[in-house]
Amino acid sequence: MVLNYIWIAFFVIAFVFAVIGLAMGDTTIFQKIVDSTFDSSKNAFEISLGLTGVLALWLGIMKIGEKAGVVNVLARALSPVFTKLFPDIPKNHPVMGSIFMNIASNMLGLDNAATPTGLKAMAQMQELNQKKDTATNPMIMFLVLNTSGLTIIPTTILAFRASYGAAQPTDVFIPILLATLVATLAGIIITSLWQRINILQHVLLFTIFGMCAFVGIIIWGFGQMDKNTMNTVTTVASNMILLGIILCFILAGFFKKVNVYDAFIEGAKEGFTTAVKIIPYLVAILVGIGVFRASGAMDMVIRGISWSVEQCGFNSDFVGALPTAIMKPLSGSGARGMMLEAMKNYGPDSFVGRLSCIFQGSTDTTFYILAVYFGSVSIRNTRHAVACGLLADLAGVFAAIIIAYLFFG
């Protein structure tokens, strides 16, 4: 229901801004908005088309793991933690393994693996759903974990900084790690409070402290490396782990006497079906965002925030990076464009350039994830998913600003 109102608001606000723009002499404003609808529709289809092959690959690999029993082993291993965080999912259910694969892929920055495993997890949770058009508590918790975007290796951002000539491309690594950790913990706490999950249970507290310790070790380890070594290690480690997962699943299937090839084909067929399912949802959300942006409403919001901050007497250095923060929940490619624009205009080593990179890495594309994940299982009533996801994003934004001032202010 919340998504419904937000989608309507995109068009209403865009029309109001277009009328104001026309009154002020901009005769091309309506054409820009209409053009954006066609561009966004085409972009949505191209995204779905691009996902088809990746979905086929990873759903095929997941099917091998499922038949080989690997997913069940992961589910049993993670059951003590996930049964506390997802109390409505039966103990040792295979979805636990899919959730782990998705979270692990996100942490390693392996987007190509994260989306298919995430969609697989949604399909498995939908099998447990009594109301097929309504999101369940486990679905919402899972979505919030995705939208908070916990990433240990932000490879793409580091590569962009290097290409723009940053003196030290990896200097945003630790700030991104800290900001995304805050966003993830905030998402878990907010959703747990909403769903009345007791986060003070020993298992959950131990897991949270363990996550913090793990991140601390990663920060310390990378802190001992120069930028070239760090870039090499992150690239090699990410791809080696990805290939290792594929090989482990295939070998597990072989030793369990599974017909690995047939299992892969069976799973891959689901990839095409899933890709087709999400097209309408992607078109809807990307067109809504497109008209909102083309109308100039986004620019007005940013200017309004800048003016408000300055009137309050606060340091407004961060405002130049806000377009990336505001765009990130709406569009990943849009936020990436804002980040690159900030580095181009202000410089990659400027405060704004660095903060825009931290914004880009601290959270994920909330509305895109909601559209794709819920769309894949035809969920229409998203309940508190949008609110929890955006609150986690907001926590990540505030954390990013504070951390940027601590490191680079």
PLM features per residue range, with description:
Residues 5, 32, 44, 60, ...:
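Hydrophobic alpha-helical context, especially transmembrane and signal-peptide helices
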Residues 100, 104, 139, 230-233, ...:
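Generic signal for short, ordered secondary-structure residues
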Residues 24, 85-89, 127-132, 164:
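Alpha-helix termini
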Residues 113-114, 121-160, 166-196, 322-409:
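C-terminal transmembrane helix pair
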Residues 1-53, 159-292, 311-312, 384-409:
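Signature of multi-pass transmembrane helix bundles
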Residues 30-127, 256-345:
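Membrane-embedded alpha-helical segments and adjacent helix-loop junctions characteristic
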Residues 1, 50, 89, 94-96, ...:
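Residue-level detector of functional hotspots within protein domains
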